[in-house]
Curated annotation (Swiss-Prot):
Belongs to the ATP phosphoribosyltransferase family. Long subfamily. The keyword Cell membrane does not apply. Catalyzes the condensation of ATP and 5-phosphoribose 1-diphosphate to form N'-(5'-phosphoribosyl)-ATP (PR-ATP). Has a crucial role in the pathway because the rate of histidine biosynthesis seems to be controlled primarily by regulation of HisG enzymatic activity. Pfam families: HisG (PF01634). It is an enzyme of class 2 (transferase). Feedback inhibited by histidine. InterPro entries: ATP_PRibTrfase_cat, ATP_PRibTrfase_HisG, HisG_C. GO terms for cellular component: cytoplasm. It is found in: Cytoplasm. Gene3D superfamilies: Periplasmic binding protein-like II (3.40.190.10). One of its GO terms (molecular function) is ATP binding. This is ATP phosphoribosyltransferase. It comes from Archaeoglobus fulgidus (strain ATCC 49558 / DSM 4304 / JCM 9628 / NBRC 100126 / VC-16).
Length: 281
């Protein structure tokens, strides 16, 4: 199930919950005024941005939407976007005489010379790398932070069993996502004085270390740390007397609490029970 169609399926009651993007949900809200869908939880994935971009080659002197409006005047302009309703609202807001279309293939390809299909595009991006590679320049921001969200059917939330399953599933999803940036950080400290200094340092910096005694004295220490902090933490701990420093990925236990309960119509991949002849699954 593609995230682009998820809000519609949840609205129609073909599923109880699923994952989509805030941009996709907003586009559907503008198009169909969804009444039965709500966001249960925002997922901790890195957000993206919804931007307006033009071809640097076609419009070399355009750096802002105001520059673009001055350049095109009242003439008809073409806007390519996978979010046509958002694009129409944007065009109306800025007084553009626009024809909006959903491109076939990559949105940025609609700007490629010598025969571009569009004057500007409204596209999702994370860092803007692909746009730069295609000689596209960002001239405006439509949505600053676009998050992935878990959406649910409002009627499904009235069923306490379904609600509990979905809440458990979202908790599991968040734990798995958040653990991707974490590592287990292990080391031994043979000297008791060094151990006390290291434990004091760790607790002062927000860590909650697990300490296990070693057979020949000292202790083995374990903490969970963000991957980005390891290269800074390692020399500090080593300088304080730590030995045999090692790291490993954090393995989420994966209790799968949702799957252990009665299945329900969820459009994002857990086991479910429904007639095999259903055209929607």
């Amino acid at each position: 199930m593609r995230p682009q169609i998820m809000p519609f399926y949840i609205e129609m009651g073909k599923g109880d919950g699923g994952i989509t993007g805030e941009d996709i949900l907003q586009n559907w809200m503008l198009k169909s005024n969804l009444k039965n869908v709500e966001i249960l939880e925002e997922l901790p994935l890195r957000p993206t941005k919804l931007v307006v971009a033009i071809s640097e080659e076609i419009y070399p002197d355009v750096y802002t939407i105001e520059d673009f409006k001055e350049k095109v005047g009242d003439r008809e302009v073409f806007i390519a976007s996978e979010f046509p309703e958002i694009a129409r609202k944007y065009a109306e807001k800025h007084g553009l005489n626009a024809i909006v279309f959903d491109p076939i293939g990559k949105t940025e390809a609609a700007l490629l010379p010598p025969m571009p299909e569009a004057d500007l595009i409204i596209e999702i991006t994370e860092f803007g790398t692909t746009l730069k590679e295609n000689m596209c320049r960002i001239i405006d921001l439509v949505m600053d932070k676009v998050h992935s969200v878990f959406i649910v059917n409002k009627e499904s939330l009235k069923d306490e069993e379904k609600k509990q399953v979905m809440e458990n599933l979202v908790t599991d999803l968040k734990e798995v996502i958040e653990s991707r940036n974490l590592v287990s950080f292990y080391f031994n400290v043979p000297n008791e004085d060094d151990l006390r200094r290291i434990i004091d340092y760790l607790t002062e910096n927000g860590f909650d270390p697990t300490i296990s005694p070693l057979a020949k004295g000292g202790a083995a220490v374990h903490i969970i740390v963000d991957r980005s902090r390891v290269k800074f933490l390692k020399p500090i701990i080593r300088g304080m007397g730590a030995k045999r420093i090692a790291t490993s990925p954090v393995i989420t236990s994966g209790t799968n609490r949702a799957a252990q309960q009665k299945p329900f119509y969820l459009l994002s991949g857990i086991q479910r029970e429904f007639p095999s002849a259903s055209p929607f699954f």
